[in-house]
């Protein structure tokens, strides 16, 4: 049976090799069987540029290349941690970068794909940060710096983000319901798949003249979350990470 997989928020990092091992296992199991694998942002804890050819990054790229060489398609979307993923990375991995807000046909169902951070409109401080780092001029300026400088800046941003989040109300860091309705109506879809919030769940959404569904992927911690879509259904599931 044809099916497509979605994952997000793996936050791959050298300090957590078990997550990369779990991803390698997932891709080995489904490579050549699944129609496609979509990674909806925050694949890496940080990505400071495609020229950062560490052994860990090269291992991840090799795993993606093995998967894509089986004939299964591979798609990457930027998240709030890995917005510097570029064309060189995608080419080496054998995948394709897709934009936030891409609509795909899942066996007759039109689904809107997002990382999910743009849906958290009440977190105004974060949205200002997002607008800054998504500017091509800012990214180009970042990439002209040395790897050591970029790493230091990324570490500083991560620490600042953690400190900011400690003082935020939980609802501010979740999606804004009105924004969810707006983007789904604008895209003309009944289904939205996203990550970012680390709150895996399936939500019913009241649209103007119909009910929709919001599918939320979880982050990879002690378990790995994924969505499997086929012509029969869409399922949110998880498996333990050793």
Sequence positions of predicted segments:
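Core catalytic region of metal-dependent phosphoesterases/phosphodiesterases
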Residues: 2-3, 12-106
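Divalent metal-coordination and catalytic microenvironments
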Residues: 9, 37, 42, 64, ...
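Short histidine/acidic/glycine/proline-rich micro-motifs that form metal-
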Residues: 10-13, 119
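A structural signal for the main folded, soluble domain(s) of proteins
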Residues: 24, 240-242
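Conserved beta-sheet core of the metallophosphoesterase superfamily
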Residues: 92-99, 112, 117, 123-128, ...
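A short acidic, often aromatic-flanked loop/helix-cap motif at beta-alpha or helix-coil junctions
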Residues: 103-106, 222, 242
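Active-site-proximal loop/helix segment associated with metal-binding centers of metalloenzymes
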Residues: 114-175
């Amino acid at each position: 049976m044809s099916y497509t997989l979605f994952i997000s928020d793996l936050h791959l990092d050298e300090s957590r090799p078990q997550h990369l091992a779990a991803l390698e296992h997932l891709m080995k199991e489904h490579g050549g069987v699944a129609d496609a694998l979509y990674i909806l942002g925050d694949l890496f804890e940080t990505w400071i540029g495609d020229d950062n050819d560490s052994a860990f990054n090269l291992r991840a790229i090799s795993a993606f290349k093995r998967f894509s060489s089986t004939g299964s398609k591979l798609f990457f979307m930027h998240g709030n941690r890995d917005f510097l993923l570029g064309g060189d990375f995608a080419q080496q991995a054998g995948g394709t970068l897709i934009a936030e807000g891409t609509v795909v046909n899942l066996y007759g169902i039109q689904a809107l794909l997002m990382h999910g951070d743009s849906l958290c409109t009440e977190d105004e401080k974060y949205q200002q940060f997002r607008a800054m780092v998504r500017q091509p001029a800012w990214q180009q300026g970042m990439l002209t710096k040395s790897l050591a400088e970029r790493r230091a800046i990324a570490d500083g941003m991560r620490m600042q983000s953690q400190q900011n989040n400690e003082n935020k109300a939980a609802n501010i860091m979740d999606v804004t319901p009105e924004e969810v309705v707006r983007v789904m109506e604008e895209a003309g879809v009944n289904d939205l798949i996203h990550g970012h919030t680390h709150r895996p769940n399936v939500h019913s959404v009241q649209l103007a003249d119909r009910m929709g569904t919001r599918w939320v992927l979880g982050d990879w911690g002690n378990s790995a979350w994924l969505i499997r879509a086929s012509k029969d259904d869409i399922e949110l599931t998880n498996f333990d990470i050793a």
